[in-house]
């Protein structure tokens, strides 16, 4: 059977995005992205493709790279494709490879318009190297699934249309069309792990197992399918854990949360799968050996206040739910004199407070819980606020941010908590609107 031309394979890979708002090639000037850009430029002569453009990210990590933007400009000019050059700062410390990648993808996202597709030139050999590299690092299924053919990126999508094409095929195309490209000297440095795999390990594997690269890439595709199935299962379980209940909190408490009991009924593996899907959008998660914090939070008694601290925040329990609190969640500062109680009061870092109904006589002040407060209730007399909040099922992490209304030293109301947010005689209610643009409450 004759080989399918690269042009046809590329068109097939990009078929789902033919109606995109534009195709932008991540153009380093190296062999792989040069071939991808040239292929697309040739196809655009005979096919109705989305508008083509290119983006070169300049890391400034080595002197040789300073000439690459000019090379990329010359290539794009010859092909009639507009080019943007984005200069980035790479964070120092840690892995320079990872820091450069992070800076590069931030630039990709910042330059990708709504509905546009960013095209990168990773190929079959890259996929095999990624699988082996992550296997050596003890990655889980998601990591071993290697690079997806496409994924969301900002308001658009990132696509890798050459994952089924070998490095040798790209080299043959470049030579046949007499293309010029730049060589990154750092790609020859075996101190970088990926370079060591590419230059030392992969050739030895291929010399003994000629189909090693194709086999590893095929394995990654199987693992990707398994990972997709687990993602579907996580979505099903998440829906079950997001069903409203009588213990659910109203919309004003806009924090990510899921119900605890449906989660507890799942197997341990399904619990971890669900939490990875949910929390993976919010924070970096630990490896599988460091989930004892989740087990402690899950299994703690009802009167406990367990916390699982993660990189970007923490998980807490309360009101039959598990809640995500970002790292900048904090108790609010007070007190504040409410000089014009007929008008809403802006609370620094904590939204807005309003009195609905007839305004009570003053002077009024707003503060937060400090301990020892009591509240007079109709038919119940004076009751300890801590006990009242326990009865109302108010999560412990929320109590330091609930506004309290005082007249002199008398506690009049607790915002938003039914039965506690208005006086014994009625006539008004204390309403709190948390800041929806605050990461701590959105």
From Swiss-Prot:
Key words, A-Z: ATP-binding, Cytoplasm, Ligase, Nucleotide-binding, tRNA processing
Which residues are recorded as binding ATP? 28-33
What this protein catalyses is: cytidine(34) in tRNA(Ile2) + L-lysine + ATP = lysidine(34) in tRNA(Ile2) + AMP + diphosphate + H(+)
UniProt-annotated location(s): Cytoplasm
Q: Can you list the disulfide-bonded cysteine pairs?
A: none
EC number(s): the record gives: 6.3.4.19
Cited InterPro entries:
Lysidine-tRNA-synth_C, Rossmann-like_a/b/a_fold, TilS/TtcA_N, tRNA_Ile_lys_synt, tRNA_Ile_lys_synt_N, tRNA_Ile_lys_synt_subst-bd
Taking the record's annotation, the residue ranges forming a coiled coil are none
Q: Provide the primary localization.
A: cytoplasm
MF-aspect GO terms? ATP binding; tRNA(Ile)-lysidine synthase activity
| GO biological process per UniProt | tRNA modification
Task: State a single Pfam family of this protein.
Answer: ATP_bind_3
Gene Ontology annotations for the cellular component aspect, listed alphabetically: cytoplasm
NCBIfam families membership: lysidine_TilS_C (TIGR02433), lysidine_TilS_N (TIGR02432)
What does the domain comment read? The N-terminal region contains the highly conserved SGGXDS motif, predicted to be a P-loop motif involved in ATP binding.
What family does the database annotate?
Answer: Belongs to the tRNA(Ile)-lysidine synthase family.
* Protein purpose: Ligates lysine onto the cytidine present at position 34 of the AUA codon-specific tRNA(Ile) that contains the anticodon CAU, in an ATP-dependent manner. Cytidine is converted to lysidine, thus changing the amino acid specificity of the tRNA from methionine to isoleucine.
- What is the protein name given in its UniProt record? tRNA(Ile)-lysidine synthase
Q: What species was this sequence derived from?
A: Pseudomonas aeruginosa (strain ATCC 15692 / DSM 22644 / CIP 104116 / JCM 14847 / LMG 12228 / 1C / PRS 101 / PAO1)
Q: Corresponding gene?
A: tilS
